[in-house]
């Protein structure tokens, strides 16, 4: 009642002015999205005064996304660009220098510059390139990764000669004798990623991880999978040493002296261990771990290893959520970490002695990339939502008011009309509660009937929620005039491990029923025209579109991006073979009934809905032959269909001009069938 009375007292001219201001804002289309600065990798200086971070922008004319490094005071102030063509800023221990990676010379190499960007100096000039740089804690050495030939190691003359033979040889055949031989968009080849070290002043590099294994792991590895001890004597890293990496998620942690020497395995878990971080006092090693071998979507726990005794503790064993990023408190007494929950991601903390894990910061957003200031008073992190891209924030380490340190996208956002996500819940399969989110069109009128677009996420162990995406941006689709619905069916993360595991061996079962329950809900909304609905998805979402093709005609149009059409053929074409083995209880010859039950290709005679099929020729996760099979089946049955294949894209469409083309054709296709 009080709210209604307050609204009634607002003068009519002010209401008209507010409406006019909203009307002046432009719809947030894909061209507006291309104007945004993409912020990431914030790094707090050791003296706690500055934050360095990466910014990626879009150059449509050159069809590139160049990267720059910026700095901003932790106390607040205007961010300042200090380097072009630069990525991965890492501070020196005395906060006077920043190491970074740049390909300004043609190949990625390690550089160092002053903290204000002055005096850039190239440190490495390796034929195999360099990346992932870290400063040693005494400031004397740099640790980085390079893809070297195992028999050459850090001998660059040897590596250069072998690269010349590869480049100039008349025969380009790939000879493969084992698995895993390619990943995402990259063929494995003969080279391996190794950790190398070099003096900060330059000089000869030393190979710290010799041999025929990748560090970090070629698959399921990343730039956070190695760390240097506070006393500077050793490096901890993750490595998969199993005989057949293609069927194994088993990365263990190893330590090696920073001067080189034999490595020692410090974890024996049969599943994944990664993201090691030493405590500031050097007493502990914290890391993330899963416990079920072969299950890449098992729960990520926060583990604590006492280095002197070998005592191992799962700090978050009672927390039925995944631990994402984490950071140590300066006195080594507790750890801050981020946890995904029901479409959001919060910051929590826990003592090294275990116990409760209170929430420090939450809200309708996704918080990540947390770091704590050296005095323990402040923390920095990235913050994003479904209506605002990533910016860097600070807050008191105990929680409280948030302050934005960056505002790089304010001008673009203020000129366009974006819509906040609206949460809803429905009863799905077996009466499980299923969450979804809605995004309404700009200038929404409740008495109008809108077409609806159902977006189905990939994974299947993924989620929709308060995060910003450039590849499936709900704001762009809403600006095209759709009520956009984003369900989180069975298999989605953030609802407990059982909810995730319910997708295993049941790809077209409960998840499909959950999506149909959301479809029923959306179709009955008073402002939705239930006869003008479309659905789209990528990866597993594309699989679900292919499944929908054979099981319902509720939708007027479909878009299948990188979708799995035939489970049997896809299982031996994909690279991460542990995935089908876990999801379907083995390979097709082990469990043929499971593959036959859930393969969309076996329901091809029911296909009727107009479908746009999109694939990338460089997609090694769901090879584009899956899309060719689907399109052929649609065409032979005279189902209206179109095939788009990007020869220069993989599982995702990443190049700016390709992205513009993708969005235009996507929106035009569904519009042809939902706006007649």
Question: What spans do the regions from the language model cover?
Answer:
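A flexible loop/linker signature enriched in serine peptidases of the S9 family
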Residues: 55-68, 81-88, 99-111, 119, ...
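Active-site-proximal cap/loop segments of hydrolase catalytic domains
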Residues: 473, 478-480, 486-676
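Non-catalytic accessory segments flanking enzyme active sites
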Residues: 43, 143-145, 171-177, 181-211, ...
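Blade-terminus and WD-like Trp-Asp/Gly-His loop motifs, strongest in beta-propeller folds
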Residues: 43-50, 89-97, 133-141, 226-234, ...
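Beta-strand-rich domains and repeat architectures in extracellular enzymes and scaffolds
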Residues: 31-67, 190
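Short beta-strand element of the alpha/beta-hydrolase
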Residues: 440, 448-458
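The serine-hydrolase catalytic nucleophile loop
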Residues: 449, 460-474, 489, 625-626
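Short loop/turn segments that connect beta-strands within beta-propeller blades
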Residues: 73-77, 114-118, 199-203, 257-261, ...
